[in-house]
Protein backbone atom coordinates (compact mmCIF):
# COMPACT_ATOMS: atom_id res chain seq x y z
CA UNK A 1 0.00 0.00 0.00
CA UNK A 2 1.50 3.31 -1.16
CA UNK A 3 0.98 5.62 1.79
CA UNK A 4 1.56 8.95 3.50
CA UNK A 5 3.10 8.82 6.99
CA UNK A 6 1.98 10.97 9.94
CA UNK A 7 3.07 10.83 13.59
CA UNK A 8 1.37 11.90 16.83
CA UNK A 9 4.29 12.94 19.03
CA UNK A 10 2.99 14.19 22.36
CA UNK A 11 0.12 16.53 21.56
CA UNK A 12 1.28 17.34 18.04
CA UNK A 13 0.46 15.64 14.73
CA UNK A 14 3.40 15.91 12.34
CA UNK A 15 3.97 14.60 8.86
CA UNK A 16 6.77 12.06 8.56
CA UNK A 17 9.29 14.58 7.16
CA UNK A 18 9.07 16.71 10.31
CA UNK A 19 9.07 13.69 12.59
CA UNK A 20 12.20 12.29 10.92
CA UNK A 21 13.96 15.66 11.01
CA UNK A 22 13.13 16.10 14.71
CA UNK A 23 14.36 12.59 15.50
CA UNK A 24 17.69 13.42 13.83
CA UNK A 25 17.94 16.74 15.66
CA UNK A 26 17.50 18.73 12.45
CA UNK A 27 14.49 20.72 13.55
CA UNK A 28 11.89 21.01 10.82
CA UNK A 29 9.24 23.41 9.68
CA UNK A 30 7.08 24.56 12.56
CA UNK A 31 4.41 25.91 10.23
CA UNK A 32 0.93 24.55 9.72
CA UNK A 33 -0.03 22.22 6.87
CA UNK A 34 -1.74 23.34 3.67
CA UNK A 35 -5.32 24.34 4.23
CA UNK A 36 -8.12 24.28 1.67
CA UNK A 37 -10.63 27.02 1.01
CA UNK A 38 -12.82 25.76 3.87
CA UNK A 39 -9.93 25.99 6.34
CA UNK A 40 -9.64 22.24 6.85
CA UNK A 41 -7.65 20.71 3.99
CA UNK A 42 -7.18 17.11 2.99
CA UNK A 43 -5.09 14.42 4.64
CA UNK A 44 -2.52 14.64 1.84
CA UNK A 45 -1.75 18.28 2.62
CA UNK A 46 1.41 19.31 4.39
CA UNK A 47 3.99 17.17 2.55
CA UNK A 48 6.72 19.75 3.26
CA UNK A 49 7.29 18.62 6.85
CA UNK A 50 4.71 20.55 8.82
CA UNK A 51 2.74 20.49 12.03
CA UNK A 52 -0.75 19.48 10.93
CA UNK A 53 -2.57 19.72 14.28
CA UNK A 54 -1.99 20.11 17.99
CA UNK A 55 -4.04 19.54 21.15
CA UNK A 56 -4.30 22.05 23.97
CA UNK A 57 -6.76 21.74 26.88
CA UNK A 58 -9.09 19.25 25.14
CA UNK A 59 -9.25 21.30 21.94
CA UNK A 60 -7.64 20.06 18.73
CA UNK A 61 -6.42 22.90 16.53
CA UNK A 62 -6.19 21.97 12.85
CA UNK A 63 -4.50 24.61 10.74
CA UNK A 64 -5.34 28.22 11.45
CA UNK A 65 -9.08 28.01 10.90
CA UNK A 66 -10.52 24.80 12.39
CA UNK A 67 -10.82 23.59 15.97
CA UNK A 68 -12.47 20.54 17.49
CA UNK A 69 -13.60 20.46 21.14
CA UNK A 70 -13.04 16.94 22.53
CA UNK A 71 -15.19 15.45 25.31
CA UNK A 72 -14.44 12.03 26.80
CA UNK A 73 -17.70 10.55 28.00
CA UNK A 74 -16.95 8.50 31.12
CA UNK A 75 -20.39 7.48 32.35
CA UNK A 76 -19.95 3.91 31.12
CA UNK A 77 -17.16 1.35 31.16
CA UNK A 78 -16.88 1.58 27.37
CA UNK A 79 -14.73 4.24 25.74
CA UNK A 80 -16.72 7.09 24.18
CA UNK A 81 -15.50 10.38 22.84
CA UNK A 82 -17.30 13.24 21.11
CA UNK A 83 -15.88 16.14 19.17
CA UNK A 84 -17.66 19.28 18.04
CA UNK A 85 -16.23 21.60 15.40
CA UNK A 86 -16.39 25.36 15.61
CA UNK A 87 -19.10 25.11 12.91
CA UNK A 88 -21.23 22.71 14.97
CA UNK A 89 -20.45 19.40 13.20
CA UNK A 90 -20.43 16.43 15.58
CA UNK A 91 -17.82 13.66 15.55
CA UNK A 92 -18.14 10.50 17.69
CA UNK A 93 -15.80 7.64 18.52
CA UNK A 94 -17.20 4.65 20.42
CA UNK A 95 -16.36 1.20 21.69
CA UNK A 96 -19.39 -0.89 20.65
CA UNK A 97 -18.26 -4.15 22.26
CA UNK A 98 -16.79 -5.37 25.52
CA UNK A 99 -13.17 -4.84 24.38
CA UNK A 100 -11.42 -2.11 22.40
CA UNK A 101 -10.54 -4.51 19.57
CA UNK A 102 -13.07 -2.74 17.33
CA UNK A 103 -13.84 0.96 17.54
CA UNK A 104 -16.33 2.94 15.47
CA UNK A 105 -15.98 6.54 14.34
CA UNK A 106 -18.56 8.86 12.83
CA UNK A 107 -17.15 12.11 11.48
CA UNK A 108 -20.07 14.39 10.57
CA UNK A 109 -21.83 11.49 8.85
CA UNK A 110 -18.74 9.75 7.43
CA UNK A 111 -18.44 6.29 9.04
CA UNK A 112 -15.22 4.46 9.91
CA UNK A 113 -14.31 1.25 11.70
CA UNK A 114 -10.94 0.82 13.41
CA UNK A 115 -10.02 -2.82 14.01
CA UNK A 116 -7.06 -4.22 15.91
CA UNK A 117 -4.58 -5.92 13.61
CA UNK A 118 -3.62 -8.46 16.28
CA UNK A 119 -4.75 -9.18 19.84
CA UNK A 120 -1.12 -8.77 20.98
CA UNK A 121 -0.39 -5.39 19.35
CA UNK A 122 -1.94 -1.94 19.48
CA UNK A 123 -2.01 -1.55 15.70
CA UNK A 124 -5.32 -0.79 13.98
CA UNK A 125 -6.56 -0.76 10.43
CA UNK A 126 -8.90 2.12 9.51
CA UNK A 127 -11.76 1.02 7.28
CA UNK A 128 -14.25 3.19 5.40
CA UNK A 129 -16.89 0.72 4.31
CA UNK A 130 -14.88 -2.22 3.03
CA UNK A 131 -11.90 -0.12 1.89
CA UNK A 132 -8.73 0.07 3.98
CA UNK A 133 -7.83 3.76 4.18
CA UNK A 134 -5.09 3.67 6.79
CA UNK A 135 -3.17 1.91 9.53
CA UNK A 136 -2.39 3.21 13.02
CA UNK A 137 0.45 1.75 15.11
CA UNK A 138 0.99 2.81 18.73
CA UNK A 139 4.58 2.81 19.94
CA UNK A 140 6.05 3.62 23.33
CA UNK A 141 6.13 7.39 22.76
CA UNK A 142 4.34 8.09 19.51
CA UNK A 143 1.49 6.91 17.33
CA UNK A 144 2.39 6.35 13.67
CA UNK A 145 -0.32 6.77 11.03
CA UNK A 146 -0.01 5.40 7.48
CA UNK A 147 -2.69 6.70 5.12
CA UNK A 148 -3.41 4.92 1.84
CA UNK A 149 -3.03 6.97 -1.33
CA UNK A 150 -6.58 7.11 -2.66
CA UNK A 151 -8.02 8.38 -5.93
CA UNK A 152 -8.67 12.09 -6.16
CA UNK A 153 -11.98 12.88 -4.49
CA UNK A 154 -11.75 9.80 -2.24
CA UNK A 155 -9.16 11.26 0.16
CA UNK A 156 -9.96 11.36 3.84
CA UNK A 157 -10.64 14.86 5.12
CA UNK A 158 -7.78 15.97 7.36
CA UNK A 159 -10.20 16.68 10.20
CA UNK A 160 -11.36 13.01 10.10
CA UNK A 161 -7.78 11.74 10.23
CA UNK A 162 -6.92 14.05 13.13
CA UNK A 163 -10.01 13.14 15.19
CA UNK A 164 -9.83 9.37 14.61
CA UNK A 165 -6.11 9.12 15.28
CA UNK A 166 -6.26 11.36 18.38
CA UNK A 167 -8.94 9.04 19.77
CA UNK A 168 -6.54 6.14 19.09
CA UNK A 169 -3.95 8.03 21.17
CA UNK A 170 -6.51 8.29 24.00
CA UNK A 171 -7.38 4.56 23.82
CA UNK A 172 -4.04 2.96 22.99
CA UNK A 173 -1.60 5.32 24.73
CA UNK A 174 -3.43 6.42 27.91
CA UNK A 175 -0.26 7.05 29.92
CA UNK A 176 0.82 9.95 27.70
CA UNK A 177 2.16 13.13 29.25
CA UNK A 178 0.11 16.21 28.42
CA UNK A 179 1.98 19.41 27.72
CA UNK A 180 0.64 22.88 27.14
Where are these regions (language model features)?
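Intrinsically disordered, low-complexity proline/glycine-rich segments
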Residues: 1-180
Amino acid sequence: MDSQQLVWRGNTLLDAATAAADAQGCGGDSGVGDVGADGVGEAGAGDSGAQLAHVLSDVIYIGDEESLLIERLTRTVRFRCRGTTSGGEVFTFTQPGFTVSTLVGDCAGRSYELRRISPWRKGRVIMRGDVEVGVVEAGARELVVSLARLDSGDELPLIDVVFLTWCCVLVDMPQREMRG
